[in-house]
Amino acid sequence: MTTQAGKTAGWRKTAMQATVGAIAGAGGMSVGLTLAEGQGGVDWAPSSIILFGVGFIFALMGLFVGLGTAAPNLVGRRLLNVADAEEIVEERSSMGASSACCLVLGAALMLLAYSVAAGAAALVSPAAAYWILLVVLGGFTAVSLWMWQSFDELWRQLTVEISAITGNVMMLVAIVWGGAAAAELTAGPQPLDLVSLAFGSMLLACFVAAGRRGMMAPR
């Protein structure tokens, strides 16, 4: 009976997390695009919309983890897939760093998508947005190397798996899409498509690798 009750509570928590994520994602994406369009002169081509969406997912993940880390009892144990608030407290430093990285990286990706869509009307030029993204990536890499030192064997293996899956997905898409474009069967990728492919593949790899190890199961 206790086991069944625990499973039911776990699935309720998962349903709540999915609902909150869906509402926040759809609402935030709509508001973000609307605000950008309100400036005038913004042409949201599919490539820009996709990259903006990928960046928004990173930012939303960072926001959720950040809120959960800041308030483990009030928010974290309900919003994040953890056993209890104590687990968050134990991992607070790494979770906080991951949260900050996701937030900043997501913002940089959205900025690049917006700057390309807005063109001359953008508050930040595409070149400036690109250099900002490179700086953010440098910081992201530095934080990742710092976190690697404190990872146990499980997290190190998970990180390697994520990298491998990301690379394989990118290679598969590049071969199929590039080959099809060369054969004039479809249009080739736009520059922003390549950026979206890289970070979108990493997002997918995170979920796949975590799911394979049972880390996505309700807790």
Question: What are the residue ranges of the model-derived segments?
Answer:
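Alpha-helical transmembrane segments
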Residues: 44-64, 120-137, 195-197
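Membrane-water interface at loop-to-transmembrane-helix junctions
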Residues: 85-105
